[in-house]
Amino acid sequence: MIFKKESDVREYLKFIINDIEDSEEMSHYDMESIRSIIEIKVRKSYYDKWMIEKYKYDKLMKLCGSKGCYYVVAYDHKLYWYDLKDIDISELELSIMDCPKTTDFKNNKIVKKESYILPNHKKNI
């Protein structure tokens, strides 16, 4: 399966995980089950290192409570996933990058964003 849009990833995850559902539209994460919350990113390019915006990471870790917290990155025909609770904060490299303010709109303003570089040895395929 080729993952071109977030909806492609959602459809696939619903197929392989029994009790997973879409989260509410304005939620800080994309999907949830009784056991976990999931944030999804679809990338158009491959990177040697994947990142998560610090704001997003902090929000997810606060909201997940006792649930699992997963970050799923889709690129082409592969899904990479990170168990964020399995990554010690000391393993995260902080980087400040110029990025679009949001990814939802074209011609978006470029702003500086703090992002964590996720450790490759914690990546699951």
What are the roles of these predicted feature ranges?
Residues 100-125:
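Charged phosphate-binding loop/patch that engages nucleotide di/tri-phosphates or the phosphate backbone
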Residues 31-46:
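Conserved catalytic cores of phosphodiester-cleaving nucleases, focusing on short active-site segments
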Residues 64-87:
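Nucleic-acid nuclease catalytic cores
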Residues 18-20, 38, 68-70:
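Hydrophobic anchor at the start of a short beta-strand
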Residues 44-58:
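Active-site-adjacent loop/helix micro-motif of nuclease/hydrolase catalytic cores
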Residues 1-25, 79:
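Acidic-basic catalytic patches of nuclease active cores, encompassing PD-(D/E)XK
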Residues 45, 79, 87-103:
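Acidic, low-complexity, intrinsically disordered interaction modules
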